Amino acid sequence: MTPRGLLYIPIGTPIIAVESGYVEAIGWNQYGGWRIGIRSFAGKRYYYYAHLRQNYPYREQLKEGDVVTAGDVIGYMGHTGYSTKENVNNINTVHLHFGLQLIFDESQKEGNNEIWVDCYNLTRFLYKNRSTVQKVGESREWKRTLQMTDPAVVKYQKTVKKQ
């Protein structure tokens, strides 16, 4: 682990959602490669997971707007990115770029007012308290072994259904 939020772990290692929320961004980014952005339900935290695996970066059928629960498998470790062409491994070292952005008002979402947290101590804590996962048969998928109900997910889903 490094102070810049980079984790060096073998390719294909499952990536776990840190906090429950909804998928705000998913897809190719020329710098981050295959990446996922998850916004907390309160809208105050944004988690960025980048450089995911080539050809099979995400949990099956994960898409923008989906709700994820803390501990869910969301993607897989890789080294994609630094290319305008999709699905390219232009990074020499397999790693996860993990970022946490704090947002207290809309002006902090993009631009000079962004607040990004040094994730070193957070990643150490999360590693020690990580969700247990298991491989799904002969597939490329992994899933959590213990299911849980997050009250924040239930509340969010009820709010969305009312709209």
Q: Which residues are covered by each model-predicted region?
A:
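N-terminal post-signal-peptidase region of extra-cytosolic proteins
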Residues: 2-10
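Residue-level detector of conserved, well-ordered beta-strand and adjacent loop positions
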Residues: 2-3, 39, 50, 78, ...
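Zn2+-dependent peptidoglycan hydrolase active-site motif and core
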Residues: 10-12, 17-61, 85-94
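A structural signal for short beta-strand/turn segments enriched in small hydrophobics and glycine
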Residues: 21-23, 65-77
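Short, charged beta-turn/beta-strand-edge "cap" motif at the junction between a beta-strand
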Residues: 29-31, 73-82
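Short coil/turn motifs at secondary-structure junctions
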Residues: 43, 82, 103-105
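Acidic, glycine-rich catalytic/binding loops that coordinate metals and/or anionic ligands
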Residues: 86-163
